[in-house]
């Protein structure tokens, strides 16, 4: 009798817990897959793939990590042939994941992650419509998972990111997002990313995304910079963190710190090649006026990069090296060939390529005045945070020395940004205000960017009325080459 009872008890236990056993079998973070994920997050793709090859191909976590590896390879190389060869894997992996245990909180997260991997890759290859549908479907999967498993932290890494993106949508388009079933705001997304930062699996990635949101959507503060430095120092063997740390610092006018991250980045055969690093190093040399060094870096980038993005931008910067490095007419002639190349190579998917193409088209048709060299040197130095050099270039000049309205607007904008970077907002305001006034009639990009910076200045002064007015003014500018990034930042500031 006791034996019978024991058997019934065992059978009952198995029936009760069988769904959890199946779930565990479908989505298992084995020690090997944990090591592989850690390696992938460091851009050590080959060692991760070797580790994954020892794991079951039926494991949903293995499928996710295989996809993660493909995403990293495609995103860092921009290789069109590789994209054509690998793109069918998205639907194959989704089909397999859909058949796995849908009572597991991991199933919808893994489906969403695969879709978001390919959305990111497709955007880089100019497939915007397909990428958009992947994002929409990923959002719905994550929203459903949140309802079913509200305390499951891995959901919130990507859901929080999407809520930030939705919160950046302009007011006159929010109805489209709502019609598609997309809801969320920036504060909600940031809170979710903060929560996901505590997750043992996705925590590191969530923290990195939060830094990128602060840098590319919001306003990156000195406090953010200190937290970023500490975060990167805690992971000295992580190439991905060093790379993104460098791009964030460069974006925010701290090129010396960006250079420090790249100089201290981990290297070796285990790490994925990043040709774009040569481009960043070239940028920093160009900002410093070290033209031979910049040329070497840009040429190395072109020799190793297989994609179509950043080509226009790189040839434009090679033009700048020769144009700014030789004030004689011979320098103008020698540099012209690089601008002609800008027109014929690459594509205009990214903003830097759009700006390069616009400059090349204008210069080749109309030429450039000597004053534009001065403004360009000041711009490059200021963008890198080398404000002493930037002021040295512009101090001998005043607005009156620039005959053309676009030059007058740019002079004022550059002076305003220099003082803003030197934490002298009171000195910056008159210059930025003048740049805005000069830019409005012709809708010059300097007006939009000046309005954005004035919004930030008044926000810092806690003058919300003026800040809001300037953010709205920034959005009102039409058809300039930086509209996407300016509008996103202005909308984000308005929605905070």
List where the protein language model places each region.
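Alpha-helical repeat scaffolds
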Residues: 47-54, 83-98, 130-143, 181-195, ...
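Alpha-helical adaptor scaffolds
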Residues: 208-216, 247-251, 375-385, 401-447
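Terminal, low-structured helical/coil segments at or just beyond the last alpha-helical repeat
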Residues: 231, 357-372, 380-384, 468-469, ...
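"A position-specific structural signal for the A-helix of alpha-solenoid helical repeats
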Residues: 34, 65, 69-72, 110, ...
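Short coil/linker segments at helix-helix boundaries
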Residues: 39, 43-47, 66-230
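Generic helix N-cap/helix-start motif at coil->alpha-helix transitions
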Residues: 25-32, 59, 104, 152, ...
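Solenoid-like repeat scaffolds
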Residues: 26, 53-60, 101-102, 148, ...
């Amino acid at each position: 009798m006791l034996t019978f009872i024991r058997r019934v008890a065992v059978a009952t236990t198995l029936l009760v817990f069988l769904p959890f056993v199946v779930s565990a079998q479908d989505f298992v973070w084995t020690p090997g897959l944990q090591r592989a994920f850690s390696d992938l997050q460091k851009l050590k793709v080959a060692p991760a793939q070797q580790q994954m090859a020892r794991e079951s191909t039926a494991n949903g976590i293995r499928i996710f990590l295989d996809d993660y590896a493909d995403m990293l390879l495609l995103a860092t190389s921009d290789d069109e042939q590789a994209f054509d060869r690998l793109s069918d894997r998205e639907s194959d992996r989704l089909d397999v994941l859909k058949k796995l245990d849908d009572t597991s909180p991991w199933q919808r997260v893994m489906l969403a992650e695969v879709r978001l991997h390919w959305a990111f890759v497709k955007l880089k290859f100019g497939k915007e419509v397909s990428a958009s549908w992947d994002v929409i479907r990923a959002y719905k999967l994550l929203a459903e998972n949140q309802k079913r498993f509200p305390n499951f932290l891995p959901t919130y890494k990507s859901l929080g990111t999407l809520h930030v993106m939705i919160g950046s949508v302009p007011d006159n388009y929010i109805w489209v997002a709502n019609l598609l079933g997309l809801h969320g705001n920036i504060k909600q997304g940031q809170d979710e990313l903060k929560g996901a930062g505590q997750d043992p699996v996705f925590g590191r990635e969530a923290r990195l995304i939060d830094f990128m949101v602060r840098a590319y959507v919001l306003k990156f503060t000195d406090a953010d910079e200190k937290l970023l430095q500490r975060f990167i120092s805690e992971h000295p063997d992580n190439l991905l963190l060093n790379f993104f740390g460098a791009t964030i610092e460069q974006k925010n006018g701290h090129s010396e710190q960006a250079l420090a991250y790249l100089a201290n980045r981990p290297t070796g055969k285990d790490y994925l090649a990043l040709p774009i690093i040569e481009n960043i190093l070239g940028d920093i040399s160009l900002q410093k006026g070290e033209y031979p060094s910049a040329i070497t870096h840009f040429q190395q980038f072109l020799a190793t990069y297989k994609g179509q993005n950043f080509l226009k931008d790189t040839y434009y910067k090679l033009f700048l090296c020769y144009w700014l490095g030789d004030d004689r007419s011979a320098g103008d002639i020698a540099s012209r060939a690089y601008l002609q190349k800008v027109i014929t190579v690459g594509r205009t998917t990214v903003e830097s390529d759009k700006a390069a193409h616009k400059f090349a088209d204008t210069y080749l048709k109309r030429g450039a005045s000597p004053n534009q060299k001065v403004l360009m040197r000041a711009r490059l130095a200021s963008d890198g945070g080398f404000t002493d050099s930037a002021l040295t270039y512009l101090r001998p000049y005043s607005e009156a020395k620039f005959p053309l309205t676009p030059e007058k607007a740019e002079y004022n904008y550059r002076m305003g940004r220099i003082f803003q970077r030197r934490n002298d907002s009171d000195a910056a305001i008159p210059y930025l205000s003048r740049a805005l006034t000069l830019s409005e009639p012709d809708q010059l990009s300097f007006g939009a960017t000046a309005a954005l910076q004035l919004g930030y200045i008044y926000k810092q002064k806690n003058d919300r009325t003026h800040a809001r007015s300037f953010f709205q003014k920034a959005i009102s500018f039409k058809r300039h080459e930086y509209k996407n990034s300016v509008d996103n930042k202005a909308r984000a500031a308005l929605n905070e």
